[in-house]
Structure formats: structure tokens, C-alpha cells
Amino acid sequence: MSTPRTIVGVSGGVDSSVAAWKLAQDGEPIAGLFMQNWADDGSGDCRAEDDRRDAVAVCGVLGIPFHFRDFSGEYWSGVFEHFLAEYAAGRTPNPDVLCNREVKFKHFLEAAQALGAERIATGHYARVAHLGGRWRLLRGADRNKDQSYFLHQLGQSQLAATLFPIGELEKSALRRIAQDAGLPTHAKKDSTGICFIGERDFREFLGRYLPARTGEIRDPQGQRIAEHPGVFYFTLGQREGLNIGGVRGRAAAPWYVVGKDVGSNVLYVDQDRDSPLLQSRWLQSEQAHWVTGAPPARSFSCTAQTRYRQPDEPCTVTVQDDGTLQVNFERPQRAVTPGQSLVLYDGEECLGGAVIAATDAPLERQLAGSSFSSEVVA
């Protein structure tokens, strides 16, 4: 058998299975490679072995070689340590973005090239086009499944060596293809959540690595409402898991996280889902990454997402001298969260993005610039 020109990242899911099937149907010399990115920690919840068996089965049906690589060490140092540091600092990271940049489109690409392949293919809902002398990252045709948000840190060399075979497909059509092709993953449930946590309780998992420290939950006026198990378990806008019972003199309505003071170990909540304390029209980012290697201009208009699957929000972007971004939105944004990814778009094209550093939300701004009085908001 000739050396495969393309190595497909087979995850054991239906998306990568159909990606491999499409390339095989095109007569492309391919092989499959399964990446183990998380070592079994003894919890009994690691899904990697089941996924690996499914990946082997798919490669068997397609009649293509199967390879295995353990990238758990690279994942730990390149993704998980950053994940823990961000949570410890009170921010909410996005490990999927780092996993794509540091593992799937770095170590996997290198492993494929070491096997003699020219490029890799994955089951991401995204598209690549070569326009104007540059490689462009485009949204997937299925807007509900589009994964360009998680791929915005990719660059020219990575896109030049990457295929997204299912980028033009709708999920419903992909399922039908998988069933008609007899792929053993055709009915497999889509994976959700953070890959290394799986179905486990998030607090229990995080508590293994970050010692919990209980503290006060306060309302915006500084009144003690309840007690929390650790501020890093919560993110802005969150409702679930606060376990705030009836509070004397307060309506029987849900509470929402509106601020975190990691230094004083205080969590701030409000009963208004759209509290003014959660609203921001401006954000500052860390250093930005541009898919084509450079921004469109020093100042330009585009649309942005500050969380996955968020509707596009019109904004104006100003590139600072140090490469960071100042972004002004046309209308207020709810719960823009430091540590999450800001991703910028021009129509179908993903321009790039950056990690959100700060916003002008009233409570966040006051917490960042004061010594934390007992009454945070007058």
C-alpha cells in the first residue's frame, strides 16, 4: 500500500468517521490516527478506550490503516496547566481553543508528517479557501455546528496542510451518509462539554487540582446572601449551582453571578438576569492572532462572538501598538467573561481573535480598580 497522502484524525465520533469516508470515496490514499489527549486518571470515566475501539472499527470498515498516538503529556503542559492557572486566577478559559492550536494542529500535524503524509484532515465543521494569495478560515455550512470559533488560532502553515471534508455538510445529512455507508458510529451521540471532564461533576473534578476555599456570596450592596464552595467554580452570568435558598425580604427568583473577587474570595450575585452589572459595551483583549498573519487595518468594523454559538455582534476593533485589541460594541453585551475567546468575523470569514482580558462592566471595573469595600455598588 502506498504512503497515505492524508492522515485523518479519527476520534471515534460520527463527524470524523464521515470525514474519512468522504476522502476514501474520492480515492484519496488515507490513514486514520487516533489521538489520546488525556491519560486515564483512575476515575473510571475516561471515554478514550471506547472512542479508540470505535475509531479502529471505522478504519476497518473503510479498509484504511489505523495509527495511535499518545499526546497526553503534550496536552497536560500545553493545555491543562493553562486551564488550571486561569481558573485559579478567577477567569474562565476555553481549553478547546488551546487544544486545537497546541495539540491537534501542532503535534498531530507533526505526527502525520512523520508518517510521510502531506496533510491532515479532521471532522470539524469549518472550511478553508485560498483567496487573494492567503489561506482563509471560513465558517462551516451548518451554522448551528460551525466550529470556526474554536479554530481561530490557526495560521497559514496549518491551514495549508489541513482539509475539513465535512465543512459543506449539514449535520442531518452527515448522519444519513454515515448510516447509508454502514459506519459503526452513525448513531453515536455527539460529545459535549470539556473532553477531560466527561460526565463527571465539574466541581469534584476541579477540586482535585484547585483546593476549594469557601467564602461569602453577597448582593451588589455588600449584604451577605449565602456561602459558596469556591469562586473559581462559577462564571459570569451563571445561575445553576449557587444553592441559594429563600432569602428573607427577597423575591423567590433565581440569582445570577455578576462578579467575582478572587482576592477577597467573594462572589457577587443579583436577581436580575440582565443586571446592568453584567452589561458591557467595551472590552480589552490580550494579544490578538490573525489567521492571515495581519489585521485588516488598524481600525475596522466587523462582527464578533464572545462565546460559542453567540449571534454575531457588530463592533469596531482598534489594534493597539502592543497587538492587543480594544473592541467597542454597537449595543451592550451580557456577561462578557475574561478568559474566554473573542472571535472576529467578516461575513463567512473568521479573521482571528484573542483572549478577553477586561471589560467595562460596572462591577468588574470597580473590583479591578479598588481595594474591595464591603459595599461594592452604591
Curated annotation (Swiss-Prot):
It is an enzyme of class 2 (transferase). It catalyses: S-sulfanyl-L-cysteinyl-[protein] + uridine(34) in tRNA + AH2 + ATP = 2-thiouridine(34) in tRNA + L-cysteinyl-[protein] + A + AMP + diphosphate + H(+). The lineage of its organism: Bacteria, Pseudomonadati, Pseudomonadota, Gammaproteobacteria, Lysobacterales. Keywords: ATP-binding, Cytoplasm, Disulfide bond, Nucleotide-binding, RNA-binding, Transferase, tRNA processing, tRNA-binding. One of its GO terms (cellular component) is cytoplasm. It comes from Xanthomonas campestris pv. campestris (strain ATCC 33913 / DSM 3586 / NCPPB 528 / LMG 568 / P 25). PANTHER family: MITOCHONDRIAL TRNA-SPECIFIC 2-THIOURIDYLASE 1, TRNA 5-METHYLAMINOMETHYL-2-THIOURIDYLATE -METHYLTRANSFERASE. It is found in: Cytoplasm. Disulfide bonds join 99-195. One of its GO terms (biological process) is tRNA wobble position uridine thiolation. Gene3D superfamilies: Adenine nucleotide alpha hydrolases-like domains, HUPs, Translation factors. The active site is at 99 (nucleophile), 195 (cysteine persulfide intermediate). The record marks 124, 340 as: Interaction with tRNA. Residues 94-96 are annotated as: Interaction with target base in tRNA. This is tRNA-specific 2-thiouridylase MnmA. Catalyzes the 2-thiolation of uridine at the wobble position (U34) of tRNA, leading to the formation of s(2)U34. Its EC number is 2.8.1.13. Belongs to the MnmA/TRMU family. ATP binds at residues 9-16, 35, 123. CDD domains: MnmA_TRMU-like.
